[in-house]
Amino acid sequence: MNIVFRVDSSTKMGTGHLMRCLAFADEFNRQNKKTTFICRNLTGSSINLVKQKNHKVITLPIDTGFQSDNFYLDLLGATQEVDAQQTIEATSENIDLLIVDSYALDETWHKKLRPCVKKILVIDDLADKNIDCDVLLNQNLGSKKEDYKNKVPDDCRLLLDCEYALLRLEFGKLRSQALEKRKNTKRIKNILVSMGGNDTKNFTYDILQNVGDGFNITVVLGMLSPHNKMV
């Protein structure tokens, strides 16, 4: 089975889209399925992390002169039409499943890829656009079927709410240990702060400024975060 991911990461965009796709891809690898990532080589991209996890990576070129009034297209670094054509040209093999995780891509892009793939799965959070896919995953708390009324095909399978959260295998292995520790904890002493890989708006710093004394605080922040020194 040939599975292709179309997902990006960058200093401006962060790493969240990529990390949840990696959770997917690592599980597919454990099942001996072939995985390929198609990523635009944006500034601050975490493409090397994908390679370290033994997934094939195909990089799309950067158009340094591209600009868009659309916030998400500006992050994407290309129009949907150009991105779709580059994605098609990047894949010479038949694709069994195309997994797309991008706020910038809607049915315009999906329809152009349809002839090249058997199935499309879209990971979404916003429910703010029309999407042409066979399966839609929104793992966020409170996401519901009504959010996607008239926005997806009638036969689209919806995977909604936290029941479908994309968590790495490590979380599952430690779940029983964590639950046992929670039962025996009477006072909170340790606090973990994680606001994403890049935290471009520096929410981490704001939180640290407002946490009282007497706690052991651990911060998780990516190496490319622009606010590392301040934190």
For the regions a protein language model found, what residue spans apply to each?
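Short N-terminal targeting/anchoring amphipathic segment
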Residues: 88-104
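A conserved mid-protein helix/loop that constitutes part of the nucleotide-sugar donor-binding site
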Residues: 19, 198-210
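Nucleotide-activated donor-dependent transferases that construct or modify glycoconjugates
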Residues: 1-14
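Short amphipathic alpha-helix
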Residues: 18-28
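Conserved nucleotide-sugar phosphate-binding/catalytic loop shared by glycosyltransferases and other
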Residues: 31-85
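Conserved nucleotide-sugar donor-interacting segment of glycosyltransferase catalytic cores
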Residues: 104-152
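A conserved nucleotide-sugar
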Residues: 34, 211-224, 229-230
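A nucleotide-sugar donor-handling region in carbohydrate enzymes
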Residues: 132-201, 227-228
